[in-house]
């Protein structure tokens, strides 16, 4: 049966500036009501550091030409760049009967299950949200909840330049090493991994009527 809680709009945004995406998802969340269909956006960002609400200035270890944006998501500082799959989840949590912790678990489990399909063993850490392979972080998470609805989401390192992570304490953890799919032997591109990750997510979110839009 086609009801609001079974419908999803999936938007492939291509490469888009972080500030543009942030403003768009903030506006979407402010303007949505009980009849608004949930959306998931998939995007790659040009190189940018984003600082979460809990972020501390000292976690930026070195200044460079890479811009820094103060965001309204949870968490600390992280880095986005081409070759990283960013997924924004614009979900009415009340309608889906989800709390924040449950949505975090959905994101973590989806990445873990996807990597397992390619013999990459990944885990979540209860005290440090994200996904890790052999102690190295492969995916970062950060959410914002407004009016009972989520925005922001996750970033999965696929095939990117990881060196700017050395300019920060990733997610506030000094010395935290980062990894990516390519380094773990998974050679699919961002475009190839995106629908596979959505498929894993939807095994838990259970949208039965999905409409896809390509905005590149």
Swiss-Prot record:
Pfam families: LplA-B_cat (PF21948)
Active site: 171
Entry superkingdom: Bacteria
A GO term for molecular function: lipoyl(octanoyl) transferase activity
Gene3D superfamilies according to UniProt: Bira Bifunctional Protein, Domain 2
Reactions it catalyzes: octanoyl-[ACP] + L-lysyl-[protein] = N(6)-octanoyl-L-lysyl-[protein] + holo-[ACP] + H(+)
Role: Catalyzes the transfer of endogenously produced octanoic acid from octanoyl-acyl-carrier-protein onto the lipoyl domains of lipoate-dependent enzymes. Lipoyl-ACP can also act as a substrate although octanoyl-ACP is likely to be the physiological substrate.
Protein name stated in the entry: Octanoyltransferase
